[in-house]
Amino acid sequence: MPLKIDRLNLMLGLAIVLSVFSSSSVMAAKVSFKEFCPQFVGQWAGDAAKAGEIPRKVAVTGFCSHDQRQLILSVSIGTRAPFSETWWFREQGDQVLLTYYDGVAEDKQQVFSLYRQNGDYSLLGEGVVNARPALIQLLFDAQAQNQAGGWQWTQNIQYLDDDIDRYQLFRGIEMTPVAPSH
């Protein structure tokens, strides 16, 4: 009889654990670029900094093409480059091609997959950062506490040649609307 009770307790415990995991973790789902693009139209302001640096004030301007297949985010003021940064995202099939230009270095390109989870958008890709292979995440975290509908844009990396198995913050940009969007 004790064996049956132990087995029943084990099964009950597994059922509880599985129900907790299935209800609390919502899987990220791939989304279309047409859903993502119009969310970032308008003018934004906030602080930006790389990890360990002092934040600087920035302005971000977002343009989405009429067909919603291209998004340009221009980040200016307070960037390390003497010119603004241009982040040109464009839909390419079920992926997103990013071209980054800062007015100083050569253009950089990266291919990403676009996901949505709990109102946040995440672009995930594999590339090279600081001459090291890395997973790259551009996370646009919806700021629910901000009634104006802002975003926290973080640029995260996870080096593939490292034992650390989590993303590390590379840079963050706060985006609070300063002008009506759309």
Give the location of each predicted region:
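Sec/Tat signal peptide C-region and signal peptidase I cleavage site
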Residues: S24-A28
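Edge beta-strand at a domain terminus
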Residues: A29, S113, L139-H182
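Bacterial N-terminal signal peptides
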Residues: M11-S22
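Short, surface-exposed coil-to-beta transition loops
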Residues: I54-A59, A81-T86, E106-V111, R132-L139, ...
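Short beta-strand segments that buttress and anchor functional surface loops
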Residues: G46-A49, L71-G78, L98-D102, S122-V129, ...
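N-terminal glycine/threonine-rich, aromatic-flanked beta-hairpin/loop signature
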Residues: R56-Q95
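N-terminal helix-cap/turn-to-beta initiation motif at the start of protein domains
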Residues: A29-A45, Q145-N146
